[in-house]
UniProtKB/Swiss-Prot annotation:
PROSITE patterns: UPF0054 (PS01306). SUPFAM superfamilies: Metalloproteases ('zincins'), catalytic domain. The lineage of its organism: Bacteria, Pseudomonadati, Pseudomonadota, Gammaproteobacteria, Enterobacterales. Keywords: Cytoplasm, Endonuclease, Hydrolase, Metal-binding, Nuclease, Ribosome biogenesis, rRNA processing, Zinc. This is Endoribonuclease YbeY. The keyword Cytoplasm applies. One of its GO terms (biological process) is rRNA processing.
Length: 155
């Protein structure tokens, strides 16, 4: 049994062709248990309008984005296994996969890995942080049987 509880929310209009719950569970299980014990993650799949609104509200960016991470911060003295929420925009993920000539499944997996690392406190604001985070993403993706998501940038 998985140590990561997944709450999958399908808030996008078209559900056709989306990864299934088992795939999202596999991707979470590939990253989170390496860093902490039992936890719960909500993954909400949204359309561009919701992604755009959230990205503008929380990041000041006036466009939709691939993944937003919202870590849960429990009040002092309360311990809960809730790690946080990932908001993933279907259209942006599909467009990026096509533009970057990546298999769609691999790009979905990468967005879950990338967002999960943000929930765990990793970031890519400065070069050192970015290098560490990208290295972890690559290691995790390779362990799950996918290619290095940054291979095109390294060539």
């Amino acid at each position: 049994m998985s140590q990561v509880i997944l709450d999958l929310q399908l808030a996008c209009e078209n559900h056709s062709g989306l990864p299934d719950e088992a795939q999202f569970q596999r991707w979470l299980d590939g990253v989170i248990p390496q860093f902490q014990e039992a936890s719960e993650v909500t993954i909400r799949l949204v359309d561009e309008a919701e992604s755009h609104d959230l990205n503008l509200t929380y990041r000041g960016k006036d466009k939709p984005t691939n993944v937003l991470s919202f870590p849960f911060e429990a009040p002092p003295g309360i311990e809960m296994p809730l790690l946080g929420d990932l908001i993933i925009c279907r259209q942006v993920v599909e467009q990026e996969a096509q533009e970057q000539d990546k298999p769609l499944e691999a790009h979905w997996a990468h967005m879950v890995v990338h967002g999960s690392l943000h929930l765990l406190g990793y970031d890519h604001i400065d070069d050192d942080e970015a290098e560490e985070m990208e290295s972890l993403e690559t290691e995790i993706m390779l362990a799950m049987g996918y290619e290095d998501p940054y291979i095109a940038e390294k060539e």
